[in-house]
């Protein structure tokens, strides 16, 4: 019995070591490549294995205790048998002592039978646990094989996710650089404000000193007038005395004395006046020299121009700052929502049972592979959006410039040539009342991103990047780590576009038939232009990359493509003109005139699905 018990314990330990080694070799490279859901599942399996190991160890310890107890009872039985033999040889017949020994022997036999029965029960339990361990080991090996089968696909998917995360990190760094530039511009504006305040203070001080000196001059003039009045009074009194004196000698004497006194008074007055004038001139020269040394000479016209330029710069910077703050607030809110969704998914996954987690992990692995294929399919559109944002971010530091026209090549198919892009739409930001227009005329101010159809960075682009085309798959940048269930929730399914089939009568009374997918329709066709319209009343739509083609009896007349980022507001329209009216709008087709007869058919395509017709328009009469 003891030999069997220890042998079974050794084999069980070897089995555990083998399982542990298989686990280590099977999951050694998996932990780094699996999602957090796989890590949680693996941890729970490891805990269950450790718990089963501990239970088997306890059972083996109990078995060893029973074996030791059986050995002890066997030794005690031998001792009792020996004593009984001695007593039997020494005494004859049965007595009280013999009955006691018989009772002890019977009790020992019962204990031995109970021990044997317990041993058998433990053997059965060990056999049952061994079957359970084999079943669990089989499930675990199946899971390891399934994970190994998808490991290469996971590596490729992780590389793609790493690239997307790197691009997102690059955009975040560029956003931080723009924020630093905004802070620097604020600091420079504060310095300009301080300099203006200092100059104003100096001007006020000079005006105060001037007023004070003017008061001093008025004081001196009043004192001089008072002295003149007193002197005139004295002279008149002396003249009265002279007239009363009739002696010629006295008159001559007083005349000479009076003339001498007048000369002295005049000399003293002139000396005092010259001294005061010199003091005032010296003081004013000194003040002027001090002002010239402390501040540069300011031209009034130049000062007005610089003040107007500074005000324009401050207004533009404030508008850009408001747009960037609005966009940052919207992105922070989106990140918080995505984080909450991810935490809720992780919490739900952590509550699932072990078998359900294994099944869910397999389903999620399959779903992840499918979703990564979808991400690969959407990679072209995502790269286009990333390039668009890169252009916008690179153009965020463009300074004030004057622009007349902005030529750009528009690729056209069929029998068309090159075109020139001239923006016709005007965007107005409500936060700063600053318009960014691409109309072919002289314009000043801050242009963000060059000629991009008048789209401003900030609230405008922030709304597009989240609620527009990027909202369908832009969240893949946040799929780094976490459970596969979180990946499936963040990479949202693209909702199928709604099909519209309309018949009606236009303003001229002609019947038409229009069909389109989504919210962009061909609204009107005239000999001068083709009009596209966003029929949605609440959502803005990106029409960048859309291509319009016109056919006559099945033959291509011409085509034009919107090859710049263009966001249409709700109920907004954009027109494509013919070659003679290309200066009237931003886009044109290289044709003399558009055909709006019943033989013509106008179609629209998207750049993500260039061969799928998104809309068509025909006249019925």
Curated annotation (Swiss-Prot):
Stated name of the protein: Intermediate filament protein ifc-2
Pfam families, per the entry: Filament
Residue ranges constituting the IF rod domain according to the UniProt record: 52-400
UniProt key word Lyase: no
UniProt xrefs under Gene3D superfamilies: Single helix bin
Function field: Cytoplasmic intermediate filaments provide mechanical strength to cells.
Span list, region Head: 20-55
Subcellular location: Cytoplasm
UniProt GO cellular component terms: cytoplasm; intermediate filament; nuclear envelope; nuclear lamina
């Amino acid at each position: 019995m003891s030999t069997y018990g220890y042998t079974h314990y050794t084999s069980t330990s070897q089995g555990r070591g083998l399982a542990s080694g298989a686990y280590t070799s099977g999951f050694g490279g998996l932990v780094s490549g699996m999602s957090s859901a796989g890590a949680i599942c693996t941890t729970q399996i490891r805990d269950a294995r450790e718990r089963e190991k501990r239970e088997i160890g306890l059972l083996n310890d109990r078995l060893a205790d029973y074996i030791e107890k059986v050995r002890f009872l066997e030794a005690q039985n031998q001792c009792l048998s020996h004593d009984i033999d001695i007593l039997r040889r020494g005494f004859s017949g049965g007595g009280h002592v013999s009955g006691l020994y018989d009772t002890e022997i019977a009790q020992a036999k019962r204990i031995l039978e109970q021990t044997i029965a317990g041993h058998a029960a433990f053997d059965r339990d060990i056999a049952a646990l061994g079957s359970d361990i084999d079943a669990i080991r089989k499930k675990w090996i199946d899971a390891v094989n399934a994970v190994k089968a998808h490991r290469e696909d996971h590596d490729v998917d992780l590389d793609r996710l790493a690239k997307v995360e790197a691009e997102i990190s690059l955009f975040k760094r560029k956003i931080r650089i723009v924020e630093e530039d905004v802070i620097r511009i604020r600091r420079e504006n504060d310095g300009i404000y301080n300099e203006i305040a200092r100059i104003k203070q100096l001007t006020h001080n000079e005006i105060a000193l001037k007023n004070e000196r003017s008061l001093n001059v008025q004081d001196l003039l009043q004192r001089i007038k008072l002295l003149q009045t007193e002197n005139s009074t004295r002279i008149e009194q002396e003249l009265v005395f002279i007239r009363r004196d009739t002696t010629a000698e006295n008159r001559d004497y007083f005349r000479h004395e009076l003339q001498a006194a007048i000369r002295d008074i005049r000399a003293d007055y002139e000396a005092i006046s010259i001294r005061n004038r010199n003091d005032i001139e010296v003081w004013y020269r000194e003040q002027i020299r001090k002002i010239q040394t402390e501040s540069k000479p300011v031209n009034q016209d130049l000062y007005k121009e610089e003040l107007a330029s500074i005000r324009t710069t401050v207004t533009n910077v404030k508008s850009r700052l408001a747009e960037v703050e609005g966009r940052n607030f919207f992105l922070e809110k989106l990140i918080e929502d995505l984080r909450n969704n991810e935490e809720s998914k992780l919490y739900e996954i952590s509550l699932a049972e072990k078998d359900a987690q294994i099944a869910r992990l397999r389903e999620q692995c399959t779903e992840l592979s499918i979703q990564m294929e979808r991400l690969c399919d959407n990679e072209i559109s995502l790269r286009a959006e990333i390039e668009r944002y890169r252009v916008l971010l690179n153009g965020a530091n463009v300074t004030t410039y004057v622009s007349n026209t902005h030529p750009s090549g528009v690729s056209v198919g069929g029998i068309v040539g090159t075109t020139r892009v001239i923006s016709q739409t005007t965007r107005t930001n409500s936060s700063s009342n600053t318009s960014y227009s691409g109309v072919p005329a002289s314009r000043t101010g801050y242009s963000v991103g060059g000629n991009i159809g008048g789209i401003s960075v900030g609230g405008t682009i922030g709304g597009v990047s989240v609620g527009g085309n990027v909202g369908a798959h832009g969240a893949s940048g946040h799929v780094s780590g976490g459970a596969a269930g979180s990946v499936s929730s963040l990479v949202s399914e693209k909702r199928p576009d709604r099909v519209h089939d309309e018949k009606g009568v236009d303003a001229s009374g002609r019947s038409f038939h229009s069909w389109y997918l989504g919210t962009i329709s061909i609204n009107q066709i005239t000999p001068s232009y083709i009009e596209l319209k966003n029929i949605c009343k609440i959502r803005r739509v990106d029409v960048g990359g859309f291509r319009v083609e016109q056919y006559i009896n099945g033959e291509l007349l011409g085509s034009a493509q919107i090859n710049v980022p263009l966001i249409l507001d709700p109920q907004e329209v954009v027109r494509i003109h013919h070659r003679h009216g290309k200066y009237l709008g931003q886009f044109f087709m290289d044709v003399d005139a558009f055909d709006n007869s019943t033989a013509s058919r106008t179609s629209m395509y998207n750049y993500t699905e260039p061969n799928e017709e998104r809309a068509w328009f025909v006249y019925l009469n």
